[in-house]
């Protein structure tokens, strides 16, 4: 393990391992946190990518063996690339990777739309919602306070997106692709589904809105076009929005009932539901 902000350590790790494939998912991945810690965001999301790319190019020149890189980018760039420190850092990293590709590195960029699973960090709004619904269902709290509920996003299952990433790296040529479901949902839809999955019915009686929680410069709509990935990879997301939210709520209920926050049983693929894709 290495701190990607440590350029010497990261460079030494690459030289020691001499990888055939690198999947760079390291990031300050919270837009909200990027406003609070913009310097950290640049160091991890942009500068570390510059160091990694330089190390991989040096390895390739030294060994004469191709190395392939997948760089995880973000749907936030598809909105306003200057809207947040996070978006700016990811846009800059994309340029670093494309430049390296022009100089012979087999580097692909995947613009990942929101990808969820029961392992989502507690600081993210999706987990705040599923955890809150679970806590209310178990009588551990009475209300959930949220910000803006009418933003529209493309929520998918992380496991589906990992398959797309694998296919991108295995492709004959480096690719730049959006990775998402193409199915829009409001944040309110996620709230309603989570409360229904927790057995509470309508969410409205339990939810308050606080304007102070609205993020600055939040893009109203971010939804992927899944067609490029389907054409290039034969890939399309197979897990529905409802299945993902249901799985997250089920695991949060299990966490609260057992006191076990992390378990390999939480890694299971969401169960198929009878709900249509939507």
Where are these regions (language model features)?
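NAD(P)-dependent short-chain dehydrogenase/reductase
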Residues: 85-87, 91, 95-154, 158-169, ...
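Conserved C-terminal active-site "lid" loop/helix of NAD(P)H-dependent oxidoreductases
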Residues: 158, 189, 209-236, 254-255
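Residue-level signal for the nucleotide or nucleotide-sugar donor/cofactor binding architecture
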Residues: 5, 36, 44-47, 84, ...
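Mid/C-terminal beta-alpha module of Rossmann-like enzyme folds, strongest
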Residues: 129, 136, 170-216, 226
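Amphipathic terminal alpha-helices
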Residues: 240-278
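Non-catalytic, hydrophobic alpha-helical segments
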Residues: 161, 165, 179, 190, ...
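Core catalytic loop region at the nicotinamide-binding pocket of NAD(P)H-dependent oxidoreductases
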Residues: 139-145, 165-179, 203-205, 256-263
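N-terminal Rossmann-like NAD(P)+-binding domain of SDR-like oxidoreductases, especially those catalyzing
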Residues: 1-115, 239, 266, 272, ...
């Amino acid at each position: 393990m290495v701190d990607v902000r440590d350029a010497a350590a990261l460079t030494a790790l690459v030289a020691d391992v001499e990888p055939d494939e690198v999947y760079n998912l390291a990031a300050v991945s919270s837009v909200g946190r990027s406003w609070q810690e913009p310097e950290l965001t640049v160091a991890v999301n942009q500068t570390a990518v510059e160091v990694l790319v330089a190390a991989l190019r040096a390895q390739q020149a030294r060994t004469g063996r191709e190395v392939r890189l997948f760089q995880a980018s973000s749907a936030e760039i598809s909105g306003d690339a200057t809207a947040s420190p996070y978006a700016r850092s990811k846009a800059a990293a994309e340029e670093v990777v494309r430049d390296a590709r022009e100089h012979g590195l087999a580097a692909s960029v995947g613009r990942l739309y929101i990808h969820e699973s029961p392992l989502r960090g507690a600081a993210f709004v999706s987990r705040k919602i599923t955890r809150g619904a679970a806590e209310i269902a178990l009588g551990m709290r009475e209300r959930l306070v949220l910000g803006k509920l009418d933003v529209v996003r493309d929520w998918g299952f992380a496991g589906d997106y990992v398959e797309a990433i694998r296919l991108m790296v295995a492709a004959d040529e480096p690719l730049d692709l959006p990775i998402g479901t193409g199915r829009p949902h409001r944040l309110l839809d996620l709230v309603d589904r989570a409360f229904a999955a927790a057995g509470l019915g309508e969410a409205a009686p339990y939810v308050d809105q606080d304007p102070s929680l609205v993020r600055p410069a939040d893009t109203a709509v971010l939804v992927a076009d899944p067609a490029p990935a389907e054409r290039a990879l034969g890939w399309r997301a197979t897990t529905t929005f409802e299945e993902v939210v249901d799985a997250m709520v089920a695991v949060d209920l299990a966490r609260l009932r057992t006191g076990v926050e992390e378990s390999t049983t939480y890694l299971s693929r969401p169960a198929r539901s009878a709900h249509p894709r939507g």
